[in-house]
Structure formats: C-alpha cells, structure tokens
C-alpha cells in the first residue's frame, strides 16, 4: 500500500476513535480532591440597564460548612437566567456549576431599564471552598436561551482578603425540625424581618405555623424527613416593612419593601448580601424571609429566596406559592395586567421553568384527549394565554395548583 494511502487510511480510522475518546463522559469531580468542608460566598453587584451589564465582586466570605451534597457538584440541568461555573485553574476542569436568577435579571425587562436607566443590585453566590485556585465564571442567557460569559476571575482560597469572621452571637437560633446531617438533608431556614426585640416568641410561633403549612402539602408532606428546618431571629428597630406607595418606611433588619419594580403587591429585599450573612449562622440551602405584617403579599427571586408577610389569612398559601419560585424554580401560572415586565418570555423560545412550555404541539389539545395522556411533556395540561407573566401563548398545568393561586 502506498505511503500516502496508508496515512489516509490511518486518519480515517483514527480520527473517529480520537473523537469518541474525547467525547467520552468524564467521571464526576471528587469533592475531597477539589474542595474542603466549608463554603465560599461571593457577594457581588450587578449594574446596568436592558442593554448593558457589569458584574463586580464586592467581597468574598468563608462560611463554616458546605451543607449541600458532595456528589451533585455539576447538576444535569441549568435552571435560571444565569449559570456560574467553577474550573480548577491548573487543569481547566469543570468542578462545580449552578444556575441562578437575580433581581437585576427581572429589572432588565422593565420599562425604566429599556429606557436606559442604570441600577445596581446585590447577589450572593456560594460554592464549596476550593483547595487550590479556581476560575470563577458567570454566564448569562440571551433571548434565545444561549449562554454567554459576562464575568470571570481567578479566585485563590489562600487570599487574605477573604473574610473569615464568625456569625453574630447576638442572633437567636431556633431549630423546630432536625432530621439529619446537613450534608444529607435539605436545610430550610426562616429569617426574621420587621420583628421588634420583644417579638421573638411571635416569630417562633410564625415559624411553626409556616412549617406546618409547608409540610401539609405535597410534595413536602411525603418528603418531610428529607428536610431540616431552622430559623434565625435578628430584631428590627421597627415592625413591618417599607410601603413606598403609602409613604411608609420602616427601619428593619433586611430592608424588605413592597412596590418592587413598581408593583404594589410585589415585595422583595435589595439587601441580598446581608440576608446571606444572617443565614450563615446556620447551615442553609433554602431561604424564606418572614415579614411581621398583616398585609397581603410577598415575592421571590428564583433559586435564591422567598419572602412573605405572616399575619394575613392567606399568608401560608402565599408562602408555599413563593417557595415554588425560589426553591423549585417554577414560573407563575397567571397573568396580571399591571406587570411591569416586557418580553420576559420571548415568543417562540422554550421557557427554562419546568412547569410551563411554549411547545406548539400542545396548543389546542384538551387534557381529556386520550393522546394527551401519553404525550411526552413537562406540563400536565394546557392553560390560558398569559402563563409566566408574558402575554402570548404558553401552555401551563391545570388551574388548581399552588403556583397559580
């Protein structure tokens, strides 16, 4: 066989083998090889408008324990409008990733942002403390849900700028339910907002009531042994929260405020760094802020926290609803004409949230259709126009669900 032909045959045979080897799945990263049993929290700022974004690290903080799984370091899905990834700097190997949402991501879709008004928002991100230097990368989804890098920085765990302070001893900790090791359970934490120094017993009772509401519904009811529940109490100078439309402003621990994005019933916190600092007194995976007020309302930032008032008759239902956003990454299944979001779910793009879909083959199909019962899909039934806040066709689950009501 001529040498040229031999070389060609070698390439034809070898290249597919090389490509197959390169495409072979890599073993999951070993926690003990790359991380220590602590957490590293990155407190950052996002600033910009609808067309621009700047990410700045404010500080890095060591937390005393990594409470999450040691095996699910790279999840099979990336919920959220952002994803952050941690690469081992020496080998460039991906060793950790998480999807997340931010208050800034919601702001970018509002009319002020579209008009060019620049605002700054806080966000805290957390991952296991690495043993060696890592590359910290943040990626953002575009309107077609494709990810693009927006920030990267080398982080050295030996950096003396990393804060290693102890949690405040003045905060009171309540543990109504401990089912096991934080590394093996979901650690649910309630935080006090708008409770005066003399309201500690009321906060305890509110935590017990909300815990009962949570484990009174599925899927939490059947999985309650998978959860630890703790609460952290820090007194506020005044009771309640800010209500800007009523010209009412209160000095509180976490700065909760209604009228987020100019929506009267939408309550959020802009003190995300402080919220995570307060939560770090205990192991935490899921955060819920309880606001000492009889007013109806609440809010959430997906994959970060939820917040609700406690003394309205519907407060337990609002809490479970908002938890569906923050913990489950679910979309709203209703439409309000007063919403300030523009093109939050662009037409023709499949939403990231698992409970809504834009798939055209679901349109017009009845849940009673025999073919519907066997059709592969994420949702369990088609709903009305307007699911997920946007004003165009999006299929959604059935009417009587917590994320709708």
Task: Cite the ranges covered by each PLM segment.
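Fold-level signature of zinc-dependent metallopeptidase catalytic domains
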Residues: 160-221, 231-241, 260
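Active-site-proximal segments of metallohydrolase catalytic domains
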Residues: 229-302
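Short pre-active-site segment immediately N-terminal to the catalytic Zn-binding motif
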Residues: 202, 299-322
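Catalytic Zn2+-binding segment of zinc metalloproteases
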Residues: 323-339
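Bacterial N-terminal signal peptides
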Residues: 7-18
């Amino acid at each position: 066989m001529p040498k040229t032909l031999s070389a060609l045959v070698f390439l034809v045979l070898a290249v597919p083998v090389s490509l197959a080897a390169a495409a072979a799945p890599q073993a999951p990263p070993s926690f003990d090889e790359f991380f220590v049993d602590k957490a590293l929290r990155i407190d950052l700022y996002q600033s910009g408008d609808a067309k621009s974004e700047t990410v700045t690290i404010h500080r890095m903080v060591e937390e005393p324990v990594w409470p999450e799984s040691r095996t699910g370091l790279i999840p099979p899905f990336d919920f959220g409008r952002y994803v952050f990834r941690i690469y081992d700097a020496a080998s460039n190997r991906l060793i950790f990733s998480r999807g997340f949402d931010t208050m800034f991501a919601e702001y970018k879709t509002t009319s002020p942002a579209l008009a060019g008004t620049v605002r700054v928002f806080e966000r805290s991100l957390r991952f296991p403390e690495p043993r060696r230097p890592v590359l910290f990368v943040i990626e953002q989804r575009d309107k077609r849900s494709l990810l693009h890098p927006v920030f990267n920085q080398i982080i050295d765990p030996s950096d003396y700028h990393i804060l290693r302070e102890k949690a405040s001893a003045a905060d009171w900790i309540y543990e109504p339910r401990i089912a096991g090791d934080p590394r093996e359970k979901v650690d649910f934490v309630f935080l006090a907002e708008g409770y005066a120094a003399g309201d500690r017993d009321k906060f305890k009772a509110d935590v017990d009531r909300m815990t009962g509401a949570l484990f009174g519904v599925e899927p939490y009811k059947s999985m309650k042994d998978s959860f630890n529940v703790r609460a952290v109490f820090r007194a506020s100078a005044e009771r309640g929260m800010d209500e800007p439309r009523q010209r009412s402003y209160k000095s509180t621990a976490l700065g909760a405020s209604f009228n987020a994005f100019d929506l009267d019933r939408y309550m959020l916190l802009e003190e995300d760094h402080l919220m995570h600092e307060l939560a770090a007194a205990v192991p935490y995976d899921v955060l819920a802020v309880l606001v000492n007020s009889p007013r109806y309302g609440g809010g959430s930032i997906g994959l970060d926290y939820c917040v609700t008032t406690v003394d309205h008759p519907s407060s337990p239902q609002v809490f479970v609803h908002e938890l569906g956003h923050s913990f489950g990454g679910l979309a709203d299944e209703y439409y309000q004409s007063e919403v300030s979001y523009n093109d939050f779910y662009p037409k023709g793009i499949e939403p990231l949230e698992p409970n809504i879909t834009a798939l055209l083959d679901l349109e017009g199909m009845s849940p009673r259709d025999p073919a519907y019962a066997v059709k592969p899909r994420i949702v369990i039934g088609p709903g009305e126009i307007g699911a997920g806040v946007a004003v165009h066709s999006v299929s959604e689950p059935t009417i009587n669900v917590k994320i709708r009501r």
